[in-house]
Amino acid sequence: MNLPCIVGWAHSRFGKLDSLDLEAMIRDVALPAIASAGLEPGDIDGVFVGHFNAGFARQDFTASLVGLAIPELRHTPAVRMENACATGSAAIWAALDALGSGRIKRALVVGLEKMKIGRAHV
């Protein structure tokens, strides 16, 4: 059995990123990460999203946004992890578990957070 390992990565620029929604943030980071691994989006077997406090996004299942941001991943199984300060670690652990068990061969792990909501509508 091969041990799972990280073979590609990317990150966004740091800052408030007010002009980007979650889909744009996912696309702008996931595509370079996949390319960094020498893969195409269609090579991915499972998507693991670490996203704490989805209430800011007004979207409870943010793992589905990966398929909207990257159409080639639309039918790829995706799950969202939420574990307070360890949310990103939980997403990595879940991907490593799926890889190590042989359930999948290639995983995409996305960690994201946007802690700002739009204007209140009354």
Predicted regions and their residues:
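Phosphate-binding/catalytic loop of phosphoryl-transfer enzymes
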Residues: 106
